[in-house]
Amino acid sequence: MQNPEPAHGVVLVADDEAGVRALARRILEGNGYGVIEAADGAEAVAIVESHACVDFLIADLDMPVMRGEEMARRIRALRPEIRVLYVTAHSEQLFTDRPELIDGEAFLDKPFTVRGLLEAVSLLKTGHIGDPSAVPAAVTTADEDSPVRRWWRKMKGLDPQ
């Protein structure tokens, strides 16, 4: 278990792919965040139960043991102030399974870029989008009219265009 001393907060990265965790760690630590890693949802929940220092959760949606959404629900039940960034390579499935993001949540497509990850975490940190044109198209938030959200509304028959 790592003991981060962050300038911008501590991010718990929960992903079953070691390479994704390593990439996120390298990007985030290089930009002033502390990082704790979990290989599955159960491990992430246990970390939050034993650490008061987690500020953000990066949650892979499709993990063994416990899916990312269930993990995030359990973690937010313990610590409602933790902000959640869902990451997945299957973005089309996200809004089919779960039509709404709630406050303090965002979504980022995998594979993500350095800029995409940093902007998504920054968005969660500030709680709003400062300049919508600065947010990459792959980031979806509860209050953004993104291509994924438009696709979802069209699929659900909510947007006839």
For the regions a protein language model found, what residue spans apply to each?
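Acidic catalytic/metal-coordinating carboxylates
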Residues: 39-43, 66-71
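C-terminal output helix
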Residues: 112-122, 133
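Short amphipathic alpha-helix used as the core "switch/output" element in two-component signaling
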Residues: 46, 69-81, 96
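Receiver (REC) domain active-site loop signature in two-component systems and cognate sites
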Residues: 63
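CheY-like receiver
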Residues: 128-161
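Active-site residues of response regulator receiver
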Residues: 60, 88
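Acidic, metal-coordinating helix/loop segments flanking the phosphotransfer/catalytic sites
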Residues: 37-56
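Charged docking surfaces used in two-component/phosphorelay signaling
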Residues: 22-30
